[in-house]
Amino acid sequence: MKIYKLKDISEFIRNGVTIKQDISSKEGIPITRIETISKGTIDFNKLGYANISKIEKYKEWLLKKGDILISHINSEKHLGKSAIYLDNNYDIIHGMNLLCIRVIDKKVFPEYLQLFFKTNQYKKQIKKITKKSVNQASFSVNDFKEILITVPDLNIQEKIIKKIKVLEKILENNKLKLAYLSELTKSLFTRMFGDIKSNDKNWKIYKFSEKLKISSGGTPSKANKIYWENGTISWIGSNMCNDEIITKNDGKFITEEGLKNSSAKIYKMNTVIVALVGATIGKTGLLKFETSTNQNIAALEIKNMDYSPEFLFFLLQNLYYKFTELGGDTFKMANLNFIKNLPLISPPIELQNKFTERVEKIEKLKFIFDKALISNIFGKLYKKVSA
């Protein structure tokens, strides 16, 4: 058992090649982007393109089996996230804004290193080298090279990797269960409240503005440090709207001064939010903590006891088709008037509460199958080895 710095077990640790990517293109050899590893795996649907057909110029930047990509410029929540490349039959160019680490075979297996990148020991070291700015966080390549890792003999690493593969099968099975439970909630909503488009249960319809308080937030000036530095007030953007219950923010906070000197406002727990612009337009969130938001989010607060937050949250997801009908091929945008005029069906609150009870049961099951449970097992396995 030895302790190494990452630089001592690597052929290289480097940033990618600078290539101007064409967002409208899907032609040529794909290039990695920050989003490529956003889910902790190589997502082949989130690669960039620049119409590159000849590989000669970029041959040295092609990923090889066992290469690990690391996010070193991102929101604090995603900083240090990694993904391992295991497909030698698919050419991908390593683009900038992700680090790539290629290990020395005789010292460590890539799969063992990827296990380390899931542990609290690694995350604590990342936290120490993180430099925060207003928009994002980052760490330098040189600081990353100094991170310490406990490395057992190769035969022990091999045994650990076999255990990991068993755990990953469990994880994959859990993902399928999570997907099933998400679909179960959607079908439950339709069974209880009918098809929203046709209103086949003939519920009375109001406009959102008649029953809900609708507003948006704001962004304190990023040129003024006192609005951001050492902030304690949670502040989120539309990237957090992913049709999910939101239990914490992604690392951005503003100060009291920032709140006072901007349109930002604090929304209470159980406020339903929806993205007005960007890649997540029409996607929703149900807040489970107090937070302020930026101007790209509409917040829906219930005026009285006629509606449950959970019902409203899933109703909005069923109204996503309205957002797809907005004009603009490349950049769609909704505004508060659009939200205010959305149709709001009015089933009895007793039925809504029954739906909420069932949703809570499903959410508990989803928690049981959450991949974080497996990540904890990874961490315990590494801790046992490195003790």
PLM segments and residue spans:
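Hydrophobic alpha-helical bundles that form the membrane domains of multi-pass transporters
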Residues: 167-170
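Active-site region of PLP-dependent enzymes
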Residues: 131, 172, 326
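Short coil/turn segments at secondary-structure boundaries
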Residues: 19-27, 128-130, 201-204, 221-228, ...
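Non-catalytic DNA-recognition/assembly elements of restriction-modification systems
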Residues: 1-16, 146-161, 177-187, 191-219, ...
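A short glycine-rich beta-alpha junction/loop motif
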Residues: 19, 90-99, 108-111, 131-155, ...
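Periplasmic-binding protein-like
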Residues: 122-127, 323
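A short beta-sheet element
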Residues: 33-34, 55-118, 237-238, 251-317, ...
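Sequence-specific dsDNA recognition surfaces
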Residues: 7-22, 35-68, 209-225, 239-269
